[in-house]
A protein has these predicted regions:
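Extracytosolic ligand-binding ectodomains
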Residues: 1-162
Length: 162
């Protein structure tokens, strides 16, 4: 195969890339957002990820102020660990929930069922700009919609693809 799609998480992907290298198998590898973090796998030869393409809504190397502020604060709290898209997704969803609750005037006196109904209503009509995308919105089933983004690993760093 010329291209191998790996819709798996980064730990397992690192094992596959290591084994492929060991047996001399050199296709182009492509992964999803679960691959974000492959460069941080302990003991993994990150040079094996060179040329790997993956979908991820977050790039810790992005130069915008919001991303750099988040990365700086995250690294300070997490002993220098660089955040991946999972951390950025978590950050975005916390603020999306906060914004939805604020817009709805949630007081804290609502039952869990009432709060769920309120949030469903808010998320059906709101749009969010965050670290992992702009104009993010949710459909009636709660599925998020945001523009896809891809990076390729070059010289050990993520490089956004046009």
């Amino acid at each position: 195969a010329d291209l191998v799609f790996l819709p798996i998480y980064y730990t397992e992907a690192a094992q596959i890339l290591t084994y492929a290298n060991r047996v001399g198998y050199t296709p182009k590898f492509f992964g999803c957002d679960g691959m974000d973090g492959i460069l941080t796998v302990e003991g993994f030869d990150t040079s094996l990820a060179e040329g790997l393409t993956l979908m991820t809504p977050f790039d810790a190397n992005a130069s915008d102020e919001a991303t750099q502020s988040f990365v700086t604060k995250f690294k300070a709290k997490m002993d220098g660990l660089v955040p991946n898209q999972f951390a950025a997704d978590g950050y975005d969803v916390i603020y999306a929930i906060y914004d939805a609750m604020t817009a709805a005037g949630v007081t804290g006196n609502e039952t869990a069922e009432e709060l769920c109904t309120i949030l469903e209503g808010q998320f059906a009509t709101m749009s969010v700009d965050g670290l992992t995308g702009t104009g993010m919105h949710w459909d009636a089933n709660g599925m998020i919609s945001k523009a896809p983004a891809a990076v390729v690993i070059e010289n050990g760093v993520y490089v956004p693809m046009g």
